[in-house]
Swiss-Prot record:
GO terms for molecular function: chromatin binding. A motif (Nuclear localization signal) lies at residues 135-146. Residues 188-342 are annotated as: Sufficient for interaction with PHF12. It comes from Mus musculus (Mouse). The gene is Morf4l1. This is Mortality factor 4-like protein 1. Residues 12-51 form the Tudor-knot domain. Pfam families: MRG, Tudor-knot. Residues 323-344 are annotated as: Interaction with RB1-2. The keyword Nucleus applies.
Length: 362
């Protein structure tokens, strides 16, 4: 019997493609192709994701354990070697399986737009309720974590229920039989567990007001912000430092702050804006082409990140310990935002959009 031949790659080096990262599709470039254990993998570069402002952590032996812990809190999806972690390098490049890559053609570009629209609608609905999207949730109360499955409506125990998972293979097979094979990976992603960050009650009204001011009253948050995201994160780090933390804890806070900043810069343009804000965003990119958005936008958009960041983290391999540690840091920062909400959030930071802007936003 002849040996089984290696699979033939569908994509070539240098080819422009679309790649799943979390629930959305992003424009990317296939940099390298590799075949290992009869599986094709591609080294993907996401267009526009490499930021000049990326933070490189200090290398310190005494805080190595903390550093590794923090890297575990902000992981990239499966298949990416740790050397390409966004906290360790200025790159978001990663190795991905072939199932995550689609041809750059009109049909897949349409799917990209549909996924983006669905995410924005879900985001807006969540803001209307003053909380993160999602109706059916169950809690790991001791970890302050909420999870849900998109396919299984029943409540899920903290350690998982073997009986429920045995029923899941059938629906994806049926769906894959009816759709283009290149979309198969979406089903895999939609089956993942969603991690939810709890927004403090004091901040929920600001999410609703922010939504109302922009989508109903057609106002815009004044940019550049009087107090930008970089400044808010720096103030938080200094606040924690003033409370006499140990070197390791101080270092951990710095790394978490750097991670939040990176996620904000990557997610803003695709997941943190309402449709009415897009012309304003285009103007900002034209006027400040080299500036990270964390130097331009302020507290309202930073708060929106915490409604969405759980969805991104859901597509990464987090164990229970790392998840609890991550949420501890994120919730502590949210408490800081709530404590300082009077100075960080104000309706006076918005302005009515002029008539010419409305024509652009149509």
């Amino acid at each position: 019997m002849a040996p089984k031949q290696d699979p033939k790659p569908k994509f070539q080096e240098g080819e422009r493609v679309l790649c799943f990262h979390g629930p959305l599709l992003y424009e990317a470039k296939c940099v390298k192709v590799a075949i290992k254990d009869k599986q094709v993998k591609y080294f993907i570069h996401y267009s526009g994701w490499n930021k000049k402002s990326a933070v490189r952590p200090r290398r310190s032996e005494k805080s190595l354990k903390t550093r590794e812990d923090i890297v575990a809190l902000f992981p990239v999806p499966e298949g990416a070697p740790s050397v390409h972690h966004p906290l360790l390098t200025s790159s978001w490049d990663e190795w991905v399986p072939e199932s995550r890559v689609l041809k750059y053609v009109d049909t897949n570009l349409q799917k990209q737009r549909e996924l983006q629209k669905a995410n924005q609608e879900q985001y807006a609905e969540g803001k209307m309720r003053g909380a993160a999207p999602g109706k059916k949730t169950s809690g790991l109360q001791q970890k302050n974590v909420e999870v849900k499955t998109k396919k299984n409506k029943q409540k899920t125990p903290g350690n998982g229920d073997g009986g429920s998972t045995s029923e899941t293979p059938q629906p994806p097979r049926k769906k894959r039989a009816r759709v283009d094979p290149t979309v198969e990976n979406e089903e895999t992603f939609m089956n993942r567990v969603e991690v939810k960050v709890k927004i403090p009650e004091e901040l929920k009204p600001w999410l609703v007001d922010d939504w109302d001011l922009i989508t109903r009253q057609k106002q815009l948050f004044y940019l550049p912000a009087k107090k930008n995201v970089d400044s808010i994160l720096e103030d938080y780090a200094n606040y924690k430092k003033s409370r006499g933390n140990t070197d390791n804890k101080e270092y951990a806070v710095n790394e978490v702050v750097a991670g939040i900043k990176e996620y904000f810069n990557v997610m803003l343009g695709t997941q943190l804006l309402y449709k009415f804000e897009r012309p304003q965003y285009a103007e900002i990119l034209a006027d400040h082409p080299d500036a990270p958005m964390s130097q331009v936008y302020g507290a309202p958009h930073l708060l929106r990140l915490f409604v969405r960041i759980g969805a991104m983290l859901a597509y990464t391999p987090l164990d229970e310990k790392s998840l609890a540690l991550l949420l501890n840091y994120l919730h502590d920062f949210l408490k800081y935002l709530a404590k300082n909400s009077a100075t960080l959030f104000s309706a006076s930071d918005y302005e009515v959009a002029p008539p010419e802007y409305h024509r652009k936003a149509v």
